[in-house]
Amino acid sequence: GPNGQLAHAQHLAHTDRLAETFYAVGDSAWCYVGNGLSNQTFIRGPEGIIAIDTGECHEEMAQALEKLRQHTAEPIVACIYSHFHYVAGTSAIVSERGDDDFPIYGHDGIAANLTRFGGEVGPRGSRGMVHQFAMMLPEAGDDARVNIGLGRFYRNPKHAPYTGGHIPATHTFGGPHEAVIAGLKVIFQPAPSDATDSVTIHFPELDLAVNNIFWPVLFNVFAIRGEEYRDPRVLLTGLDHLADLKVEHQ
């Protein structure tokens, strides 16, 4: 590898698709890959921009907003959480807007999952993440980290000190839900994957669906950091729903 890693050729090649890139998706959406472990997605509606997922920290989302501003000056008017893993940078939207007067949509299980994994099972998960995300591997040499599947790293070193900036959802739902957000029709469908509160977010007018279920890697059915088993039969239900949408962008 580029830093002297000895690894399978396919593992090394996978790093290329994780390179930091701000992709345009059609005419009304962007997806920022490689900024952290997760992506940040932005959707343009008639009334402004919808931000989907805000990353691991304030600094991560702030960098995503800087990239967005290279493409549009339209204001962010709403936020959506696809699941509870990447909801800790929302304060960056507040900083940019100068207020917190915007709706945040998400599954009603997000708050409980944040409490559970931040509290009662948090220490076990934190220890397990050291193994799962290769945190102790060197940066160079035979045994250096190549990537961690969904991202180049667990946290982007450029985002230290990783300031927490979660803001709870203001509009929650526990089942299929429809709303008009930023002037666009949005259809939410629960689709448990690596989180029980994952949802597929369908924008029929844009022929686009944002999801946390169709991954570019072998799906992690049993995270070694110590989470519960992720039943692939439930996963298949969500994948079937996504396929049935027949959207151009997903």
Segments the model singles out, each with a brief description of its role:
Residues 78-134:
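Hydrophobic or amphipathic alpha-helical targeting/insertion segments
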Residues 18-72, 200-203, 207-213:
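Conserved beta-strand hairpin/beta-sheet module of binuclear metal-dependent hydrolase folds
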Residues 54-55, 83-84, 109, 213-214:
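Active-site metal-binding loops of divalent metal-dependent hydrolases
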Residues 43, 62, 90-92, 114-119, ...:
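Short, solvent-exposed loop/turn and secondary-structure capping segments
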Residues 17, 22, 47-48, 58-103, ...:
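Active-site metal-binding motif and surrounding structural segment of the metallo-beta-lactamase
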Residues 1-19:
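N-terminal pre-domain segments of enzymes
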Residues 24, 48-50, 56-58, 113-191, 234-238, 243, ...:
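Metallo-beta-lactamase
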